[in-house]
Amino acid sequence: MRNLIFFLLLSAPVYGQNALVHINAGFNKSNDWYGIGVVTNTKVYNGYIDNNPAIKEKYNISRVPTLILFKEGQEVKRWEGSLDMKLHVKISEVQNKIDDK
């Protein structure tokens, strides 16, 4: 049921708000992005491609972890993991994009 709820959240456009989607794989969970619990002014959703394979295709995920920022239901920025399967992006960079700075 949890996977279905997550899929429905990502299937519907998010209007009038920001949504930050963090996508990873279960085998790479130790490399979840460290800033997820820190960013503000956005809803945060987490998903794992091994539990929700449709996410990989729908959002064209080629590397994990991946962060996707949506505003008014449209993707405005994407950050993808590097070859070491870690996401090297500063919290301030993500927060500035959320806040339109």
Predicted regions and their residues:
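Sec-dependent N-terminal signal peptides
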Residues: N3-V14
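Local sequence-structure signature of Cys/Sec-based thiol-disulfide redox active-site neighborhoods
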Residues: Y15-K43
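Extracytoplasmic/periplasmic, Sec-exported soluble proteins
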Residues: G47-Y48, Y59, K86-K90
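Short, glycine/charged-enriched secondary-structure capping and boundary segments
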Residues: Y34-G37, N60-I61, S82-L83
